[in-house]
From Swiss-Prot:
Catalyzes the production of GABA. The calmodulin-binding is calcium-dependent and it is proposed that this may, directly or indirectly, form a calcium regulated control of GABA biosynthesis. Residues 471-502 are annotated as: Calmodulin-binding. GO terms for molecular function: calmodulin binding; glutamate decarboxylase activity; pyridoxal phosphate binding. It comes from Solanum lycopersicum (Tomato). This is Glutamate decarboxylase. Belongs to the group II decarboxylase family. GO terms for biological process: glutamate catabolic process. It holds the Pfam family Pyridoxal_deC.
Length: 502
C-alpha cells in the first residue's frame, strides 16, 4: 500500500471530461463521490483516459514483476477473478492447487520431504508478506526457547545486509525486532557472511541472506554463511538459523545453477521465500514461503477457523484475497515444467549479456552487476562531472523507457547506478534498442557545458578563503564530492530505501 500524499488545490478538485462529455456535462469531483450515477461508457472513458499517462509495463525496466502471460492463462485468470481464496470449503480445488504449488517448490528447494509427505508452506500476496510470516516464526521460536531457559526475551534482533529490500525494515519496525545491518563497501554490494556472523549474538532470531540482491542481482554466499554460523553455534551453544530471501533468485538458481548450494541442502536454512510474480512468471500478487519442516513453524501461530463451513488452518497477515494468482502459478508450473523454466531463464540471462556488452562498449559505464545472479544489469557512470545517472534516467523516459537510478546503501552511498531488470518480455531487439537510445542520450548530454573544472582531485574539498575579505571560508568540491552532494539531495527526495517492490 502506498500512502496518499496528493495535495488538493481548488483548481484541481474536479475532472473535466473530454470524450465522456457526450454523456456527462458536469465536472466530476476528484476527491468526493459524485452525487449521481453516470453511463458505463462514460465511466470507462474517464478511467481509460486517466490511465493513458501511466508508463508502458513492458518498458518498465525498474520492476521485477511479470507483465506478460499466455492468453490461455489470462482466460483462467478471468474465469476465477471472482473467487475469494479464503473460502476453502467453497473452492476446495483452489486450495488443492495451492498445496500442490507448495510441494513443488519444496522439492525444487530440496526440502527434506518424502514423496508421501506434505510440505509446509503457504501462498502469500508477495514476498513482503512471506518475509513477515517467516520472521514471526523465527521470533516466536526464539522467544519460546528463551522463556523455557528462563532468559530475557524482550530484545530480539535480526541480522541482514544493508542491501535488503525495505520489507525487512518493515518487519523489524512493525514487530519490534532490532535490525542489525552489515554495511556495504564499494565494489562489494552484498552482505559479507563473516561480518554478519560476527554481529550475531544470543538475541539473534535469524540471519537473512539474499539470493538475488535488489540492487545488483547478485547472490549472497549462503553456503559460506551456513559454515561460519554452524561454527559459531557450536562454540556458543546457540541455534541461530538462516532464512533465505529468494524473492528474485528462487526461480532462477535451481534452473541455471542447480549445483549452487543455497537452499534446504544447508542444515541451518529453515525457511525460504520466493516471489511467484517475479521470475515465477505470474502477474503481481503472489508469493510463497516454505519451511524446512513442521517443527520450524510454531503451532501457536496457526489459526483454525470454522465459520466458512469446515475447519481451516490459516497463517497469513490478511484474509480475503483473489484465487487467480494461485491458479496462474499452478498453470505456469505444469505448463513450463523444469525444462520450460530453464529455457526462459537462459533467454533472460542471454539478453542481459547482450545489454551488458552494449553498455560496456560505450566506454562510459562500469558494470556493477555480476554474471551469476538475477538477470539484472546495473551500471554506474565513470565520469559524473557533466551529468549524473539521474539525468540519464530522466532522459530515457523521452523514449518510453523507465530505468531507475539510485544510490547504494551505507557505506557505499557515493555510488549511484542505473539498473535494468531483464524479464521474460525483454527481448534481444529491445536490448539493442535500449543501448542505441542510451548512446543518443549521452551524445546530447555531452553537448552540455561542464559543471566542474576538468581537473579534479579524489580527496576532500579544498578550502579557499574569499578574496573579498568577508571572513568566510568557501569550498571547491571535486568531481567525487559533487557527485556525493547530488546523491544526498536525491536521497532526501527518494527516502532511505529505493529497492523496488517485493
Amino acid at each position: 500500500m502506498v500512502l496518499t500524499t496528493t495535495s488538493i488545490r481548488d483548481s484541481e478538485e474536479s475532472l473535466h471530461c473530454t470524450f465522456a462529455s457526450r454523456y456527462v456535462q458536469e465536472p466530476l469531483p476528484k476527491f468526493k463521490m459524485p452525487k449521481k450515477s453516470m453511463p458505463k461508457e462514460a465511466a470507462y472513458q474517464i478511467v481509460n483516459d486517466e490511465l493513458m499517462l501511466d508508463g508502458n509495463p513492458r518498458l518498465n525496466l525498474a520492476s521485477f514483476v511479470s507483465t506478460w502471460m499466455e492468453p490461455e492463462c489470462d482466460k483462467l485468470i478471468m474465469s476465477s477473478i471472482n473467487k475469494n481464496y479464503v473460502d476453502m470449503d467453497e473452492y476446495p480445488v483452489t486450495t488443492e492447487l495451492q498445496n500442490r504449488c507448495v510441494n513443488m517448490l519444496a522439492h525444487l528447494f530440496h526440502a527434506p520431504v518424502g514423496d508421501d509427505e506434505t510440505a509446509v508452506g503457504v501462498g502469500t500476496v508477495g514476498s513482503s508478506e512471506a518475509i513477515m510470516l517467516a520472521g514471526l516464526a523465527f521470533k516466536r521460536k526464539w522467544q519460546s526457547k528463551r522463556k523455557a531457559e528462563g532468559k530475557p526475551f524482550d530484545k530480539p534482533n535480526i541480522v541482514t545486509g544493508a542491501n535488503v529490500q525495505v520489507c525487512w525494515e518493515k518487519f523489524a519496525r512493525y514487530f519490534e525486532v532490532e535490525l542489525k545491518e552489515v554495511k556495504l563497501k564499494e565494489g562489494y554490494y552484498v552482505m559479507d557472511p563473516a561480518k554478519a556472523v560476527e554481529i550475531v549474538d544470543e538475541n539473534t532470531i535469524c540471519v537473512a541472506a539474499i539470493l538475488g540482491s535488489t540492487l545488483t542481482g547478485e547472490f549472497e554466499d549462503v553456503k559460506l554463511l551456513n559454515e561460519l554460523l554452524t561454527k559459531k553455534n557450536k562454540e556458543t551453544g546457540w541455534e541461530t538459523p538462516i532464512h533465505v530471501d529468494a524473492a528474485s533468485g528462487g526461480f532462477i538458481a535451481p534452473f541455471l545453477w542447480p549445483d549452487l548450494e543455497w537452499d534446504f541442502r544447508l542444515p541451518l536454512v529453515k525457511s525460504i521465500n520466493v516471489s511467484g510474480h517475479k521470475y515465477g512468471l505470474v502477474y503481481a500478487g503472489v508469493g510463497w514461503v516454505i519451511w524446512r519442516s513442521k517443527e520450524d513453524l510454531p503451532d501457536e501461530l496457526v489459526f483454525h477457523i470454522n465459520y466458512l463451513g469446515s475447519d481451516q488452518p490459516t497463517f497469513t497477515l490478511n484474509f480475503s484475497k483473489g484465487s487467480y494468482q494461485i491458479i496462474a502459478q499452478y498453470y505456469q508450473l505444469i505448463r513450463l515444467g523444469f525444462e520450460g523454466y530453464k529455457n526462459v531463464m537462459k533467454n533472460c540471462l542471454s539478453n542481459a549479456k547482450v545489454l551488458t556488452e552494449g553498455i560496456t562498449k560505450m566506454g562510459r559505464f562500469d558494470i556493477v552487476s555480476k554474471d551469476v545472479g538475477v538477470p539484472v544489469v546495473a551500471f554506474s557512470l565513470r565520469d559524473s562531472s557533466k551529468y549524473t545517472v539521474f539525468e540519464v534516467s530522466e532522459h530515457l523516459r523521452r523514449f518510453g523507457w523507465i530505468v531507475p537510478a539510485y544510490t547504494m546503501p551505507p557505506d557505499a552511498e557515493h555510488i549511484a547506478v542505473l539498473r535494468v531488470v531483464i524479464r521474460e518480455d525483454f527481448s534481444h531487439s529491445l536490448a539493442e534498442r535500449l543501448v542505441s537510445d542510451i548512446e543518443k542520450i549521452l551524445s546530447e548530454l555531452d553537448t552540455q557545458p561542464p559543471r566542474l573544472p576538468t581537473k579534479a582531485v579524489r580527496v576532500t574539498a579544498e578550502e579557499v578563503r574569499d578574496d573579498k575579505g568577508d571572513g568566510l571560508h568557501h569550498f571547491h568540491m571535486d568531481t567525487v564530492e559533487t557527485q556525493k552532494d547530488i546523491i544526498k539531495h536525491w536521497r532526501k527526495i527518494a527516502g532511505k530505501k529505493t529497492s523496488g517492490v517485493c
